[in-house]
């Protein structure tokens, strides 16, 4: 859904921060940094086009983090005389989504007689930094009944976004209330019983199965290595045993001290 707006970009129109979020340090709130992007422009030359648009232009992203597209302001300028007929439809598209109805984030229609127009879209969803760097947003423009010779630009579009950049979804300390609604209604758990709660979560069963599968694959690889390296001295064989298989894979899990340090740090 798109709504007409006037004037400059107002962050408060897209993000409603509570008093606690304004007062507390960033480590105690999921809102880390609110930013406005630089202006990105599209010069429309064809009656129907699907163009790439950089909605995060000038926004400093965080490695292995997230960015939430809270809002978008679109300004259009008709490069036509005042008495022209016709109009245009502008639609914001998320090109990752394969279903067309799910890919369209907001649309707007206006007549060519209105020289300048402006509207806002409120996507209000987050993507990973890795996806954001792939420039996942597009703009579908459909100009109708505007008679202009080919090669000229009847319409110019400018885009400015309001976004939230943050490193982690979870708050430090796990002092949030965790609700278990599977049996007998809500149950509030404190920090002391988080581990016990995790054992009851179905995802822990999936994780156990996943680790058992990776463990079996690792054992098979160990067997192949030991059979192929029988002529290798014992010292080299111990090195293969100590640094191969599951011990290497374990460094990629959350048990890694370096990963835990990054997750617990809160620079933003």
Curated annotation (Swiss-Prot):
Q: Name one GO biological process term.
A: transport of virus in host, cell to cell
InterPro entries recorded: TMV_movement, Viral_movement
Instruction: Tell me a Gene Ontology molecular-function term this record carries.
Output: RNA binding
Q: Which cysteines are joined by disulfide bonds?
A: none
Q: Which Pfam families match?
A: MP
Compositionally biased intervals (Polar residues) = 225-237
Name the source's superkingdom.
Answer: Viruses
**Primary localisation category:** host cell
Its localization reads: Host cytoplasm, Host cytoskeleton; Host cell junction, Host plasmodesma
GO CC annotation terms, alphabetical: host cell cytoplasm; host cell plasmodesma; host cytoskeleton
Q: Which UniProt keywords apply?
A: Host cell junction, Host cytoplasm, Host cytoskeleton, Host-virus interaction, RNA-binding, Transport, Viral movement protein
Q: Does the keyword RNA-binding apply?
A: yes
Give the span(s) annotated as Disordered. Answer: 215-243
Q: What does this protein do?
A: Transports viral genome to neighboring plant cells directly through plasmosdesmata, without any budding. The movement protein allows efficient cell to cell propagation, by bypassing the host cell wall barrier. Forms a ribonucleoprotein complex with viral RNA. Binds microtubules and modulates microtubule stability. Can bind double-stranded DNA. Triggers host hypersensitive defense reaction in incompatible plants harboring resistance (R) proteins.
- Quaternary structure, from the entry: Binds to host RBCS at the plasmodesmata; this interaction seems required for viral systemic movement. In resistant plants, interacts with host MBP2C at host microtubules; this interaction prevents virus cell to cell movement. In resistant plants, interacts with host resistance (R) protein (e.g. tomato ToMV resistance protein TM-2(2), AC Q71BG9) at the host plasma membrane; this interaction triggers host defense responses leading to programmed cell death.
Q: Which family does it belong to?
A: Belongs to the tobamovirus movement protein family.
Query: What's the protein name?
Result: Movement protein
């Amino acid at each position: 859904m798109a709504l007409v707006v006037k004037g400059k970009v107002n962050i408060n129109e897209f993000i409603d921060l509570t008093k606690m979020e304004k007062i507390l340090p960033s480590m105690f709130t999921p809102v880390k940094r609110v930013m406005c992007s630089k202006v990105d422009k599209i010069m429309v030359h064809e009656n129907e086009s699907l163009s790439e648009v950089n909605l995060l232009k000038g926004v400093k992203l965080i490695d292995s983090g997230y960015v939430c597209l809270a809002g978008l302001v679109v300004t259009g300028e008709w490069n036509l005389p005042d008495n022209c007929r016709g109009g245009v439809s502008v639609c914001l598209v998320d090109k990752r989504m394969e279903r067309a109805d799910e890919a369209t984030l907001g649309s707007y229609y206006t007549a060519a007689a209105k020289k300048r127009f402006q509207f806002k879209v409120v996507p209000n969803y987050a993507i990973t930094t890795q996806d954001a760097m792939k420039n996942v947003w597009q703009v579908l423009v459909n100009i109708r009944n505007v008679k202009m010779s080919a090669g000229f630009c009847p319409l110019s579009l400018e885009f400015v976004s309001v976004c939230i950049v943050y490193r982690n979804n979870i708050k430090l300390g796990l002092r949030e209330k965790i609700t278990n609604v599977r049996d007998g209604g809500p149950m509030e758990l404190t920090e002391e019983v988080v581990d016990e709660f995790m054992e009851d979560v179905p995802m822990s069963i999936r994780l156990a199965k996943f680790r058992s599968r990776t463990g079996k694959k690792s054992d098979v690889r160990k067997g192949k290595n030991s059979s192929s390296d029988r002529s290798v001295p014992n010292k080299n064989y111990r090195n293969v045993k100590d640094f191969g298989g599951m011990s290497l894979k374990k460094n990629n899990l959350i048990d890694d001290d370096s990963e835990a340090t990054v997750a617990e740090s809160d620079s933003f």
